């Protein structure tokens, strides 16, 4: 029987991943600063979210509507009246420089 060369088992250091390795505990000051950073990020995010929601509701309620002065289909004389009104307005325009 021929013996095949075998590879040595990997070292203990190579088998352990960073997840399985023990981590050292953070100091109370580091934990407090981490919590403070998390709170600040959360407050900023909630503020931005509320501003976006307020803008959305404002734009939704104030969609805006416009009034057109187009005559109905049965009123051909209304077009002539509108043209005369706009011509009168042009004569009285004054430009201040």
Swiss-Prot record:
<dbReference type="GO" id="GO:0005886">
    <property type="term" value="C:plasma membrane"/>
</dbReference>
<comment type="similarity">
    <text>Belongs to the SMAGP family.</text>
</comment>
<feature type="glycosylation site" description="O-linked (GalNAc...) threonine">
    <location>
        <position position="23"/>
    </location>
</feature>
<keyword id="KW-0968">Cytoplasmic vesicle</keyword>
<feature type="topological domain" description="Cytoplasmic">
    <location>
        <begin position="58"/>
        <end position="97"/>
    </location>
</feature>
<comment type="function">
    <text>May play a role in epithelial cell-cell contacts. May play a role in tumor invasiveness and metastasis formation.</text>
</comment>
<feature type="glycosylation site" description="O-linked (GalNAc...) threonine">
    <location>
        <position position="6"/>
    </location>
</feature>
<keyword id="KW-1133">Transmembrane helix</keyword>
<keyword id="KW-0472">Membrane</keyword>
<dbReference type="GO" id="GO:0030659">
    <property type="term" value="C:cytoplasmic vesicle membrane"/>
</dbReference>
<dbReference type="InterPro" id="IPR043243">
    <property type="entry name" value="SMAGP"/>
</dbReference>
<dbReference type="GO" id="GO:0005654">
    <property type="term" value="C:nucleoplasm"/>
</dbReference>
<dbReference type="GO" id="GO:0030054">
    <property type="term" value="C:cell junction"/>
</dbReference>
<protein>
    <recommendedName>
        <fullName>Small cell adhesion glycoprotein</fullName>
    </recommendedName>
</protein>
<keyword id="KW-0730">Sialic acid</keyword>
<feature type="glycosylation site" description="O-linked (GalNAc...) serine">
    <location>
        <position position="3"/>
    </location>
</feature>
<feature type="glycosylation site" description="O-linked (GalNAc...) threonine">
    <location>
        <position position="2"/>
    </location>
</feature>
<keyword id="KW-0325">Glycoprotein</keyword>
<feature type="glycosylation site" description="O-linked (GalNAc...) threonine">
    <location>
        <position position="18"/>
    </location>
</feature>
<keyword id="KW-0812">Transmembrane</keyword>
<feature type="glycosylation site" description="O-linked (GalNAc...) threonine">
    <location>
        <position position="17"/>
    </location>
</feature>
<keyword id="KW-1003">Cell membrane</keyword>
<feature type="glycosylation site" description="O-linked (GalNAc...) threonine">
    <location>
        <position position="7"/>
    </location>
</feature>
<feature type="topological domain" description="Extracellular">
    <location>
        <begin position="1"/>
        <end position="36"/>
    </location>
</feature>
<feature type="transmembrane region" description="Helical; Signal-anchor for type III membrane protein">
    <location>
        <begin position="37"/>
        <end position="57"/>
    </location>
</feature>
């Amino acid at each position: 029987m021929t013996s095949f060369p075998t590879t040595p088992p990997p070292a203990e250091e190579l088998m352990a991943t960073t997840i399985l390795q023990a981590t050292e505990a953070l100091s109370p000051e580091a934990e407090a600063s981490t919590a403070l950073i998390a709170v600040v990020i959360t407050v900023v995010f909630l503020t931005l979210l509320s501003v976006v929601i307020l803008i959305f509701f404002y734009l939704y309620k104030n969609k805006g509507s416009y009034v057109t002065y187009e005559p109905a289909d049965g009123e051909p004389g209304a077009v002539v009246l509108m043209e005369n009104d706009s011509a009168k307005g042009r004569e009285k325009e004054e430009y201040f420089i």
